[in-house]
Amino acid sequence: MTIASHRLFALFLCTLLLAGSAQTAPAITDPVKAGYDLAVRMDQVDTSQDSYSEAVMSINRGGKVLTRSFKTYSKHFGKDGKDEYSLIVFDRPADVNGTKYLVWSYRGLEQDDDMWVYLPAESLVRRISGSSKFASFMRSDLSNEDIQNLDDVDEYDYLLQGEENVDGIDCYVLERTPKKGKETQYSRQVQWVRKDTLLRLRADYYDKKNRLVKKLFFSRQEKIDGIWTVTQMRVERPREGSFTVIDWSNLRYDVGLSDAYFEHSALQR
């Protein structure tokens, strides 16, 4: 998921500051290159070919809580294995049982990502494109854009702003802005990347008017099949006063998923 998913993260390792030390971090001589290098290493953390997970999504709005559960299947494809399929299948509550989202994410700006949703009540497959990518994902604080798993390094410009300690955790502070031609609702994102697990700890998203519209917190992280993985995410929209929490479980890598899972025709099976 762009947003929606546990596979969005990766790797950059520098010498860690000693706990309690008064040592000062070295100056960043080229923050643009350092930011890009960080993004490249982050992109390399997930070495799996495919994955499976189960999740519960709790949507909190106006004092009411709406809960949904789903399963996610993901697989890399393409000649270099850098593109990605994702299939999200909802099973609870009953009114969304059988709803499916299928995403084909491509590296680079040359080809737009493909996204469809299957609505069982209507026996209908709808293509999600244009402004509908910015609409809410299943009434949550995530958008359809956010659930696209793949974030191509070369679709953004980067700036390593420095280092910061967040709740006792040492982080790199990385800003990224979309390159011309990338279809997105966000003007920039600021990410706090943990030095120990090298996953994002937090991310702030800004709209085209440079207003803070979304805050993401990656509060629980676990090593699964040798890969550091986010297993809980909280998404807040400060202006709306709402938030969504996703808890992942039973996550497995390299399970041998067939391409047949991700065929367009499979949505109505």
Feature locations, PLM:
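Bacterial N-terminal signal peptides
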Residues: 10-20
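Short, ordered beta-strand-loop transition motifs
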Residues: 77-84, 162-170, 224-225
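Gly/Pro-enriched, hydrophobic low-complexity segments
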Residues: 91, 114-118, 124-129, 135-151, ...
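N-terminal mature ectodomain segment of secretory-pathway/periplasmic proteins
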Residues: 30-121
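Bacterial N-terminal signal peptides that target proteins for export
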Residues: 1-12
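A short, amphipathic edge element
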Residues: 33-35, 67, 148-160, 210-215
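Bacterial Sec-dependent signal peptides at the C-terminal "C-region" and cleavage site
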Residues: 19-30
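Hydrophobic/aromatic beta-strand elements that line small-molecule binding cavities or substrate pockets
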Residues: 39-40, 69-76, 100-105, 162, ...
